[in-house]
Design a protein with these regions (language model features):
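Redox-cofactor-proximal catalytic regions of oxidoreductases
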Residues: 48-116
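Flavin (primarily FAD) cofactor-binding/catalytic cores of flavoenzymes
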Residues: 2-63, 116-256, 260-522
């Protein structure tokens, strides 16, 4: 139900309509439906700037129909939702496999060929599923829940398509959220409780505002307007370039988005024929590690094992030892994908032996660094990247990105300037008509989000020590009746939860469940 008149009053306003919002709302409605006591109807408004509610970019139309989960279903899906989700996959199998066959192209054909035998055997835990399936499942379950809670007169859910830009704390212990509609007009809603569920901060820009209107194609965010749209734009661009050697793509970053882009490119025959080279530059020069069976079950991280025998050590010693042992493992041909669980269990054990202050220091200072060291990805994604390397279509470049500037000889192409692994400042010899930013998200103290900046400026939210999330109480409050869910909880450290990132579906589900229980009990 739309709600577009100014300053409408609600009990709860959820700012953001992606997966953090939908999972929290689903838990909240389930709790309301399970109550055995009468209560007044709760009014809830959900505000989302994109024209798609409940899925966010990972599980919605901004991703590809061929975008896969980065880990297997067994690791990805929330444990409490697993039986229901697998039942849904089974019951709707003909529909979604038909959809893949009709709209998924070569990538879907290969995915079905590789995974259908496991689907028939019900071996779901081992499959890297198309992500849109989880988005469709959550959407369906939430729509059913909304209908039920409305029918019982327990809650009424309103939707507004607009961008939240500011939040004002009123004298009567309520909040006024200022919203910018698509037409540029500003409206407001008032609510007693606010749930901030806006997802991750904006992507960190690599394009200088002073660069002006360069002739090359610069894609600031791989998922805006959508990853398939951007691949189509590159294909059209390449078709107009007669010189094969100039049909190059520069990707800045080597994260999961980079890997997904490579996977999709590998299965797009049209653009593959046109493509000369993809250069992916990053500090590490590495993509996330391939998830493999435990190939080295008896491998010993000797320095970490020795550290375990010490009575006292610091968070810095722990991080240094992790990096030292990982370097030794790599030198022996053992990668994190082969020994992930041994390493993780050992690090958790050593982390728990630290005192409270040192544990918090590890979370704040080294948590994200450790996460980047142990990044993993599924076989389909890593194999596609390896195939591109073998076909001499992909080079992984280790170095520090400096800038992309328009070529002096032909502004329709970008030129990469970088510092090499040997500390030399270099210009890459290739020209790039397409540049894709996969460098990650902004830190909060240098954020371009109007809402985030206003929350900090007014003192409603305080940036935590990781610079990736907000300080919250054990009730997830950044301020009185102002709750945070999703990625902006990154760095949370209290007696209930200790996460240095809250980006995967399992963690978001857990937080949403806990917050819903808090709200219902209030």
């Amino acid at each position: 139900m739309p709600a577009n008149s100014p300053k409408q009053q609600f009990d709860i306003a959820i700012l953001g309509g992606g997966i953090s919002s939908s999972l929290t709302l689903l838990h909240l409605i389930r709790n309301l439906l399970s109550l055995n006591r009468p209560q007044k109807e709760i009014s809830i408004v959900v505000v989302e700037k994109q024209n798609e509610f409940w899925k966010g970019f990972p599980y919605g139309k901004r991703s590809s129909i061929n975008s896969l989960t980065i880990t297997t279903l067994g690791e990805f899906v929330p444990e409490k939702e697993k039986k229901s989700f697998i039942g849904w996959l089974d019951s709707t199998q003909d529909k979604w496999i038909g959809l893949l066959k009709t709209h998924g192209g070569d990538a879907s054909v290969k995915w079905i060929e590789n995974n259908y035998p496991m689907i028939q055997k019900k071996q779901w835990d081992e499959i890297y599923i198309p992500r849109f399936l989880f988005g469709d499942y959550v959407d369906e379950k939430l729509q059913e829940a909304i209908q039920n809670v409305r029918a019982k007169g327990l809650a009424n859910i309103h939707l507004i398509e607009a961008e939240a830009t500011n939040l004002l704390k009123k004298d009567n212990a309520q909040y006024e959220a200022e919203l910018k509609e698509k037409n540029g007009e500003t409206i407001s809603v008032v609510a007693g409780k606010i749930i901030l569920a806006i997802g991750s901060p904006p992507v960190k820009s690599i394009q200088s505002p002073l660069s002006g209107n360069s002739g090359y194609l610069y894609i600031e965010d791989a998922y805006l307007p959508g990853i398939e749209n951007n691949i189509d734009s590159i294909a059209q661009l390449f078709s107009a370039i007669t010189d094969q050697n100039k049909r190059n793509i520069l990707i800045v970053g080597s994260n999961a988005s980079t890997l997904e882009f490579l996977y999709l490119i590998q299965h797009e025959s049209e653009i593959k024929k046109l493509l000369n080279k993809i250069i992916a530059i990053s500090y590490s020069g590495l993509l996330p590690h391939r998830i493999t069976p435990n190939n080295f079950p008896n491998y010993q991280f000797s320095n970490l094992i020795s550290l375990r025998e010490k009575k006292n050590y610091t968070s810095t010693e722990l991080m240094d030892t992790i990096e030292k042992d990982m370097q030794i493992a790599y030198a022996k041909g053992v990668h994190i994908g082969d020994t992930y669980y041994q390493l993780s269990d050992l690090v958790v054990e050593l982390l728990n032996k630290l005192d409270e202050n040192q544990q918090k220091d590890f979370h704040s200072t080294y948590g994200w660094r450790f996460t980047k060291l142990i990044r993993r990805a599924g076989a389909e994604y890593r194999d596609a990247a390896e195939e591109l390397i073998q076909q001499k279509k992909l080079d992984l470049l280790k170095g520090k990105f400096l800038s992309v500037v328009a070529s002096k000889n032909d502004p329709a192409f970008g030129v990469l300037n970088y510092i090499s692994s040997t500390s030399q400042e270099l210009t890459h010899p290739l020209l790039f008509p397409a540049v894709i930013n996969c460098s990650g998200f902004e830190e909060l103290n240098a954020c371009s989000s109007e809402l985030i900046n206003n929350l900090v400026k007014q003192g409603l939210c305080t940036i935590n020590s990781t610079n990736r999330g907000f300080e919250v109480s054990e009730k997830f409050e950044a301020n009185d009746n102002l709750y945070i869910v999703g990625p902006l909880l990154g760095g949370i450290f209290n007696n209930k939860l200790r996460y240095w990132h809250v980006e995967n579906a399992r963690r978001i589900y857990t937080v949403g469940e806990m917050l819903a229980e808090i709200l219902v009990n209030q």
